From Swiss-Prot:
Family: Belongs to the class-II aminoacyl-tRNA synthetase family. Type-1 seryl-tRNA synthetase subfamily.
Name of the gene: serS
GO MF terms, alphabetically ordered: ATP binding; serine-tRNA ligase activity
Subunit record text: Homodimer. The tRNA molecule binds across the dimer.
Protein's name according to its UniProt entry: Serine--tRNA ligase
Record's subcellular location: Cytoplasm
Source organism: Endomicrobium trichonymphae
Amino acid sequence: MLDIKVIRENVKEVKQAMLNRNLDISFDQLLNWDSERKTIIGKIEQLRLKRNKESEEIGRLKKESKEPPAELLAEINKVRDIIQEQEKQLLTIEKHIEDFLLRIPNIPDKSVPVGKDEKDNKIIRFVGKPEKFSFKPKYHWEIGEKLGIIDFAAASKISGPHFAVLKNEGSALERAIISFFLDKHKEKGYKEITTPYLVNRASMTGTGQLPNLEEDSFKCAIDDLYLIPTAEVPVTNIYRDDVLEESALPQKYVSYSACFRRESGSYGKDTKGLIRNHQFDKVELVKFAKPETSSEELESLVLDAGNVLELLGLPYRVVLLSTGDIGFSSSKTYDLEVWFAGYGIYREISSCSNLKDFQARRMNIKVKYSQNKKRELLHTLNGSGVAVGRTFAAILENYQQEDGSVVIPNSLREYTGFDIIKP
């Protein structure tokens, strides 16, 4: 959530930042509410002063064993009623302000390229080179079904479209990928954490999924609970309404979870395979950092996510997203896009973002500095470390052999217990 003070003092700049996101937002109503709020607060303060003086006068008279005049008692009751009415109006206006601010996205960092959409993203670097095959490489779903390790028909029968059943060596490979990711990130200083898959509305609002993305979320019909779209939601919320000591930062967490999203590809090749499903597995990285170090923490987050891809021998590239492509809560995002030999293109496998104080303001997470005891909002960061299903798919496409078999990357073999999946 944005600081209303920033909007109040820099409304033209904030409006331009929204235009850079392809959003034409008028802040006139918000500023009117803000002005009205200030006026009401002033009235309440004056009325409280008046009430206090009248109460003191009543107290003085009673101390002198004198009966307070009926007019004075009536006046103090009248002031009390006016204060209560003004406080009700204040609550209504503050609710309007909060509802408005909850729907406004983060301001892009100055280093983010201004652009309309993904076509304006900036490629930062390539890591590794795609292998040239002596045969036409197949898509991962073709490979998986022929090997008997992916069963989309069974998943469709069980749940419907955009789900997958992994079997035999496929299940073992997925489990191996998850364990590999967790181990490698723990070696980098991340603390492993396991959280609930069901979270309340406050948690989803805190990270920015609600209210704007409610239609993309799976919600329980009876309880006011949501299936998590990413472990970012529960992990970031562990410090909601907390104050962290400066010496405790940065805090770095790694968490494996299943993820659930209603959105799904409706055209092209994304209607097949493991790229875009309602349920998928992901290892998530979350950081809590001091504002002055969050930019550095983002760069190291990108390196940590890329490290596991390099260890798996998967070629990828790092892309800086433009203002027209970054997510709602993000101030700056790098995508890691892995090479898919079957597709013949790079596809997103991780998004690493600096949210700055956007989530911290929604969740009231602060850092206390040791020198001056000052408390201020900290910065949160998160990134996939990385998407398990897409890694599974990338391994099938990049390590496929002409006979239909798939070689297991060297770094995974101690986790799988086998080095090849044969037809």
